[in-house]
């Protein structure tokens, strides 16, 4: 694991008057880059030719670093360019997927916003479950084996795959039938099936809750919420049940978009308590814990209980739903505030207070 001292030694060589904010051109990079510009930073977008169109059209990137493949971001020459540009990298789901978690932890020698140690805790289901449970959050019942299935379950797989390959089953037989079908279609592998995460299917309404923890203020902020727009399930439910049966289509849960939502106000104390508990436990289990953005993906059942089924320990894709600010982020200072701008504001404050060691790794 790259040490904090190694990163601070690199940062000490930076020109502090020319700090840039960099990220991979994907996932949540539009508001990360735009937010940085609004806070006065120059921005760097790592991208491929042909994939640079949105960042040029929206004019959010001051500099481009072109790669043949997104996975090239881990290469030493790209790291050297980022260091030459005095870059602080903001990680997101695509960055972690393409760079590779092992590389992020052990060989990506560029200062990153946040705690790079905690990223494994969102990626590995066992660690994620440990953190959520020990924080005292309500989580779905977990099944250790397909043979244990005794009710309706949802089957998920490791990594940031945006819901691809997820399926619902109500018996051991149905699990193996659907898994085999997805394998034949090239969506799952034997390794995926062996590592399947099987959990209770919770019936409820979806709230993906976007928090920001500021180490500088020691405060958990609520910036926004969204629900997921998924294919093909959200199209499938528009078809009458009789026709669905005749069509014999297997539902899938691939995230294709995000829809902003607000939660009933009486549930906000529960929302804040969940964020506070997670931050406190993360400090204990994975010091220094959460830094900056994190997300709790939850379902609200008919008893008005929020059940957390997934966690993001970095900026989540749903933050795209409030690029120009949202109802909750507006309440803090009466201004439109995206997650990207909130990240940049924390970096700017840390530079001004000479507390950059509190927010980078």
Swiss-Prot record:
EC id: 6.3.4.23
Residues of the ATP-grasp domain: 116-348
Highest taxon of the lineage: Archaea
Chemical reaction(s) catalysed: 5-amino-1-(5-phospho-beta-D-ribosyl)imidazole-4-carboxamide + formate + ATP = 5-formamido-1-(5-phospho-D-ribosyl)imidazole-4-carboxamide + ADP + phosphate
GO BP of this protein: 'de novo' IMP biosynthetic process
InterPro entries membership: ATP-grasp, ATP_grasp_subdomain_1, IMP_biosynth_PurP, IMP_biosynth_PurP_C, IMP_biosynth_PurP_N, PreATP-grasp_dom_sf
Protein name: 5-formaminoimidazole-4-carboxamide-1-(beta)-D-ribofuranosyl 5'-monophosphate synthetase
Organism the protein comes from: Methanocaldococcus jannaschii (strain ATCC 43067 / DSM 2661 / JAL-1 / JCM 10045 / NBRC 100440)
Gene transcribed to yield this protein: purP
């Amino acid at each position: 694991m790259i040490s904090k001292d190694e990163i601070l030694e690199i940062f000490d060589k930076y020109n502090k008057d020319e700090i840039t904010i960099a990220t991979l051109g994907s996932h949540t990079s539009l508001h990360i880059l735009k937010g940085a510009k609004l806070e006065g930073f120059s921005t760097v977008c790592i991208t491929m030719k042909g994939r640079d169109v949105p960042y040029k059209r929206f004019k959010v990137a001051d500099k481009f670093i072109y790669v043949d493949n997104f996975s090239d971001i881990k290469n030493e020459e790209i790291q050297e360019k980022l260091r030459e540009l005095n870059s602080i990298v903001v990680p997101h789901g695509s960055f972690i997927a393409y760079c590779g978690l092992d590389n992020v932890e052990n060989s990506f020698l560029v200062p990153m916003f946040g705690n790079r140690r905690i990223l494994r805790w969102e990626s590995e289901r066992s660690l994620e479950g440990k953190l959520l449970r020990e924080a005292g959050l309500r989580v779905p019942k977990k099944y250790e084996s397909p043979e244990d299935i005794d009710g309706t379950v949802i089957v998920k797989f490791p990594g940031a795959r945006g819901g691809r390959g997820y399926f619902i089953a109500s018996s051991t037989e149905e699990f193996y039938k659907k898994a085999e079908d997805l394998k034949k279609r090239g969506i799952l592998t034997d390794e995926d099936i062996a590592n399947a995460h099987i959990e209770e299917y919770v019936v409820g309404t979806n709230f993906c809750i976007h928090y920001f923890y500021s180490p500088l203020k020691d405060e958990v902020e609520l910036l926004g919420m969204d629900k997921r727009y998924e294919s093909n399930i959200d199209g499938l439910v528009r078809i009458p049940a009789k026709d669905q049966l005749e069509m014999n289509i297997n539902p899938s849960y691939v995230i294709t978009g995000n829809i902003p939502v607000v939660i009933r106000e009486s549930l906000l104390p529960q929302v804040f308590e969940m964020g506070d508990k997670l931050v406190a436990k993360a400090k204990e289990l994975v010091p220094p814990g959460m830094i900056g953005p994190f997300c709790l993906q939850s379902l609200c059942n008919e008893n008005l209980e929020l059940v957390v089924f997934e966690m993001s320990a970095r900026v989540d894709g749903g933050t795209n739903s409030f690029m120009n600010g949202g109802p909750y982020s507006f309440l803090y200072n009466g201004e439109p505030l995206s997650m990207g701008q909130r990240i940049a504001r924390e970096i700017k404050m840390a530079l001004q207070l000479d507390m950059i060691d509190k927010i980078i790794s």
